[in-house]
Amino acid sequence: GFGSSDSSANLNYIDDDLDSYETIWDGSVFKSSDSDHQKVVTALKNICSEDASTDSLAEYMDVDNILRYMAVQTFVVNLDSLTGNMPHNYYLYEKDSELNIIPWDYNLSYGGFQSGSADDVINFPIDTPFSESISLEDRQFFMALLNNETYLAQYHEYLSQLVEYVQNGKLDAVYDRITSQIDNLVKTDPTAFYTYDEYTAAKEMLKETISLRAESIQGQLDGTIPSTWEGQSKDSS
Protein backbone atom coordinates (compact mmCIF):
# COMPACT_ATOMS: atom_id res chain seq x y z
CA GLY A 1 0.00 0.00 0.00
CA PHE A 2 1.12 3.55 -0.66
CA GLY A 3 0.18 7.06 0.35
CA SER A 4 0.24 8.87 3.66
CA SER A 5 -3.33 10.11 3.31
CA ASP A 6 -4.93 6.81 2.36
CA SER A 7 -6.29 5.00 5.39
CA SER A 8 -6.53 1.65 3.60
CA ALA A 9 -2.76 1.44 3.15
CA ASN A 10 -2.24 1.26 6.92
CA LEU A 11 -4.20 -2.03 7.03
CA ASN A 12 -6.98 -0.67 9.21
CA TYR A 13 -10.42 -2.14 8.73
CA ILE A 14 -12.62 0.59 7.24
CA ASP A 15 -15.87 -1.10 6.19
CA ASP A 16 -17.07 -4.02 4.05
CA ASP A 17 -16.95 -2.06 0.79
CA LEU A 18 -14.13 -3.42 -1.38
CA ASP A 19 -13.74 -0.01 -3.03
CA SER A 20 -12.60 1.41 0.31
CA TYR A 21 -9.35 -0.53 -0.09
CA GLU A 22 -8.59 0.53 -3.65
CA THR A 23 -5.03 1.56 -2.77
CA ILE A 24 -4.24 -2.00 -1.72
CA TRP A 25 -5.77 -3.55 -4.84
CA ASP A 26 -4.03 -1.03 -7.12
CA GLY A 27 -0.69 -2.16 -5.75
CA SER A 28 -1.32 -5.82 -6.49
CA VAL A 29 1.64 -7.60 -8.10
CA PHE A 30 -0.44 -10.53 -9.30
CA LYS A 31 -3.88 -10.54 -10.87
CA SER A 32 -6.48 -10.67 -8.11
CA SER A 33 -10.25 -10.99 -8.04
CA ASP A 34 -13.06 -9.64 -5.89
CA SER A 35 -13.05 -13.00 -4.14
CA ASP A 36 -9.40 -12.52 -3.21
CA HIS A 37 -10.12 -8.99 -2.06
CA GLN A 38 -13.00 -10.17 0.09
CA LYS A 39 -10.68 -12.56 1.93
CA VAL A 40 -8.36 -9.67 2.77
CA VAL A 41 -11.19 -7.45 4.01
CA THR A 42 -12.66 -10.28 6.09
CA ALA A 43 -9.25 -10.89 7.65
CA LEU A 44 -8.75 -7.19 8.43
CA LYS A 45 -12.23 -7.01 9.94
CA ASN A 46 -11.47 -9.87 12.32
CA ILE A 47 -7.94 -8.74 13.13
CA CYS A 48 -8.97 -5.17 13.91
CA SER A 49 -12.04 -6.16 15.92
CA GLU A 50 -12.12 -5.16 19.59
CA ASP A 51 -13.14 -8.76 20.28
CA ALA A 52 -10.10 -10.26 18.54
CA SER A 53 -8.69 -13.15 20.57
CA THR A 54 -5.42 -15.05 20.53
CA ASP A 55 -7.03 -17.77 18.42
CA SER A 56 -8.86 -15.47 16.01
CA LEU A 57 -5.73 -13.45 15.33
CA ALA A 58 -3.85 -16.67 14.58
CA GLU A 59 -6.64 -17.66 12.19
CA TYR A 60 -6.37 -14.54 10.06
CA MET A 61 -2.67 -13.64 10.16
CA ASP A 62 0.70 -15.37 10.28
CA VAL A 63 1.28 -14.19 13.83
CA ASP A 64 4.79 -15.54 14.30
CA ASN A 65 6.17 -14.07 11.09
CA ILE A 66 4.49 -10.70 11.63
CA LEU A 67 5.81 -10.50 15.20
CA ARG A 68 9.31 -11.14 13.86
CA TYR A 69 8.72 -8.45 11.23
CA MET A 70 7.60 -6.03 13.94
CA ALA A 71 10.63 -6.80 16.11
CA VAL A 72 13.06 -6.06 13.28
CA GLN A 73 11.13 -2.94 12.21
CA THR A 74 11.25 -1.67 15.77
CA PHE A 75 14.91 -2.47 16.35
CA VAL A 76 16.13 -0.74 13.18
CA VAL A 77 13.63 2.16 13.49
CA ASN A 78 12.46 1.87 9.89
CA LEU A 79 9.86 4.63 9.63
CA ASP A 80 9.77 4.61 5.83
CA SER A 81 7.16 1.90 6.16
CA LEU A 82 3.95 0.89 7.90
CA THR A 83 5.29 2.21 11.19
CA GLY A 84 5.81 5.71 9.80
CA ASN A 85 3.52 8.45 8.57
CA MET A 86 3.56 7.06 5.04
CA PRO A 87 2.24 3.48 5.19
CA HIS A 88 4.09 1.96 2.25
CA ASN A 89 7.12 -0.18 1.37
CA TYR A 90 5.64 -3.57 2.18
CA TYR A 91 3.99 -6.47 0.39
CA LEU A 92 0.71 -7.83 1.75
CA TYR A 93 0.39 -11.54 1.08
CA GLU A 94 -2.80 -13.56 1.50
CA LYS A 95 -2.95 -17.33 1.42
CA ASP A 96 -5.90 -19.42 2.60
CA SER A 97 -7.48 -16.28 4.14
CA GLU A 98 -4.37 -15.67 6.27
CA LEU A 99 -2.48 -12.39 5.92
CA ASN A 100 1.27 -12.01 5.96
CA ILE A 101 3.71 -9.16 5.40
CA ILE A 102 6.80 -9.30 3.23
CA PRO A 103 9.29 -6.53 4.12
CA TRP A 104 10.75 -4.12 1.60
CA ASP A 105 13.14 -1.15 1.45
CA TYR A 106 15.29 -0.68 4.56
CA ASN A 107 17.79 1.87 3.27
CA LEU A 108 16.44 4.61 5.56
CA SER A 109 16.63 2.58 8.77
CA TYR A 110 18.15 3.89 12.01
CA GLY A 111 16.53 7.28 11.72
CA GLY A 112 17.06 7.99 8.04
CA PHE A 113 13.42 8.94 7.58
CA GLN A 114 11.30 11.31 9.68
CA SER A 115 13.31 10.90 12.87
CA GLY A 116 14.28 13.75 15.17
CA SER A 117 17.46 13.44 17.19
CA ALA A 118 19.87 10.56 17.68
CA ASP A 119 18.29 10.05 21.11
CA ASP A 120 14.90 9.56 19.45
CA VAL A 121 16.35 6.78 17.32
CA ILE A 122 18.25 5.06 20.12
CA ASN A 123 15.32 5.18 22.55
CA PHE A 124 12.54 4.61 20.00
CA PRO A 125 9.78 3.02 22.15
CA ILE A 126 9.19 -0.67 21.62
CA ASP A 127 5.57 -0.74 22.82
CA THR A 128 4.36 2.17 20.67
CA PRO A 129 6.67 1.50 17.71
CA PHE A 130 5.30 4.11 15.33
CA SER A 131 6.10 7.71 14.48
CA GLU A 132 5.23 9.82 17.51
CA SER A 133 2.52 11.74 15.65
CA ILE A 134 0.60 8.57 14.73
CA SER A 135 -2.47 7.69 16.75
CA LEU A 136 -2.42 4.07 17.89
CA GLU A 137 -5.95 3.74 16.50
CA ASP A 138 -4.46 4.29 13.05
CA ARG A 139 -2.36 1.15 13.34
CA GLN A 140 -5.02 -1.36 14.39
CA PHE A 141 -3.33 -4.21 12.52
CA PHE A 142 -0.24 -4.11 14.73
CA MET A 143 -1.92 -2.93 17.91
CA ALA A 144 -4.13 -6.02 17.81
CA LEU A 145 -0.96 -8.00 18.53
CA LEU A 146 0.57 -5.56 21.00
CA ASN A 147 -2.67 -5.43 22.99
CA ASN A 148 -2.62 -9.22 23.34
CA GLU A 149 -0.54 -10.31 26.35
CA THR A 150 0.55 -13.58 24.74
CA TYR A 151 1.72 -11.98 21.54
CA LEU A 152 3.25 -8.97 23.28
CA ALA A 153 5.44 -11.35 25.28
CA GLN A 154 6.42 -13.18 22.09
CA TYR A 155 7.30 -9.87 20.40
CA HIS A 156 9.43 -8.93 23.41
CA GLU A 157 11.21 -12.27 23.17
CA TYR A 158 12.14 -11.62 19.54
CA LEU A 159 13.45 -8.18 20.51
CA SER A 160 15.47 -9.83 23.28
CA GLN A 161 17.00 -12.22 20.75
CA LEU A 162 18.07 -9.27 18.59
CA VAL A 163 19.61 -7.56 21.61
CA GLU A 164 21.52 -10.73 22.49
CA TYR A 165 22.82 -10.98 18.92
CA VAL A 166 24.31 -7.51 19.29
CA GLN A 167 25.62 -7.88 22.81
CA ASN A 168 27.19 -11.34 22.52
CA GLY A 169 29.61 -10.24 19.81
CA LYS A 170 27.97 -11.98 16.85
CA LEU A 171 27.02 -8.70 15.20
CA ASP A 172 30.55 -7.33 15.57
CA ALA A 173 31.98 -10.36 13.81
CA VAL A 174 29.60 -10.08 10.87
CA TYR A 175 29.85 -6.29 10.71
CA ASP A 176 33.64 -6.29 10.72
CA ARG A 177 33.81 -9.05 8.12
CA ILE A 178 31.50 -7.21 5.72
CA THR A 179 33.17 -3.82 6.15
CA SER A 180 36.61 -5.37 5.59
CA GLN A 181 35.31 -6.89 2.35
CA ILE A 182 34.07 -3.56 0.98
CA ASP A 183 36.63 -1.14 2.45
CA ASN A 184 38.94 -1.16 -0.56
CA LEU A 185 36.02 -1.07 -3.00
CA VAL A 186 34.72 2.07 -1.33
CA LYS A 187 38.20 3.60 -1.27
CA THR A 188 38.73 3.11 -5.00
CA ASP A 189 35.18 3.76 -6.24
CA PRO A 190 35.35 6.66 -8.74
CA THR A 191 31.58 7.22 -8.47
CA ALA A 192 31.35 7.25 -4.66
CA PHE A 193 28.94 9.74 -3.13
CA TYR A 194 31.14 10.17 -0.06
CA THR A 195 34.85 10.29 0.68
CA TYR A 196 36.59 7.31 2.22
CA ASP A 197 37.09 9.25 5.45
CA GLU A 198 33.36 9.99 5.61
CA TYR A 199 32.61 6.31 5.02
CA THR A 200 35.03 5.27 7.78
CA ALA A 201 33.46 7.69 10.25
CA ALA A 202 29.94 6.59 9.27
CA LYS A 203 30.59 2.88 9.66
CA GLU A 204 31.88 3.41 13.20
CA MET A 205 28.94 5.66 14.04
CA LEU A 206 26.43 3.12 12.71
CA LYS A 207 28.04 0.37 14.76
CA GLU A 208 27.83 2.51 17.89
CA THR A 209 24.21 3.41 17.14
CA ILE A 210 23.25 -0.25 16.87
CA SER A 211 25.00 -1.01 20.16
CA LEU A 212 23.23 1.86 21.94
CA ARG A 213 19.92 0.83 20.39
CA ALA A 214 20.33 -2.68 21.80
CA GLU A 215 21.18 -1.23 25.21
CA SER A 216 18.06 0.94 25.18
CA ILE A 217 15.80 -1.93 24.12
CA GLN A 218 17.17 -4.07 26.95
CA GLY A 219 16.38 -1.24 29.34
CA GLN A 220 12.86 -0.97 27.96
CA LEU A 221 12.36 -4.71 28.33
CA ASP A 222 13.67 -4.52 31.92
CA GLY A 223 11.44 -1.55 32.73
CA THR A 224 14.27 0.88 33.49
CA ILE A 225 13.50 2.92 30.35
CA PRO A 226 9.90 3.84 29.40
CA SER A 227 8.70 1.76 26.45
CA THR A 228 6.06 4.16 25.10
CA TRP A 229 6.12 7.70 23.72
CA GLU A 230 3.89 8.83 26.57
CA GLY A 231 6.16 7.30 29.20
CA GLN A 232 9.26 8.81 27.67
CA SER A 233 7.69 12.27 27.49
CA LYS A 234 7.10 12.10 31.26
CA ASP A 235 10.61 10.83 32.00
CA SER A 236 13.28 12.85 30.24
CA SER A 237 16.10 10.95 31.94
Across the structure, where does each feature detected by a protein language model lie?
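Ser/Thr/Gly/Pro-rich low-complexity, disordered linker/stalk segments of secreted
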Residues: 230-237
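Active-site-proximal structural scaffolding
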Residues: 33-37, 59, 63-68, 83-86, ...
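C-terminal catalytic region of ATP-dependent kinase domains
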Residues: 93-228
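Active-site acidic catalytic loop and adjacent metal/ATP-binding pocket
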Residues: 60-112, 210
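Compositionally biased, intrinsically disordered low-complexity regions
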Residues: 3-5, 29, 113, 118, ...
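Internal "kinase-insert"/substrate-recognition segments embedded within catalytic cores
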Residues: 1-76, 124, 128, 159, ...
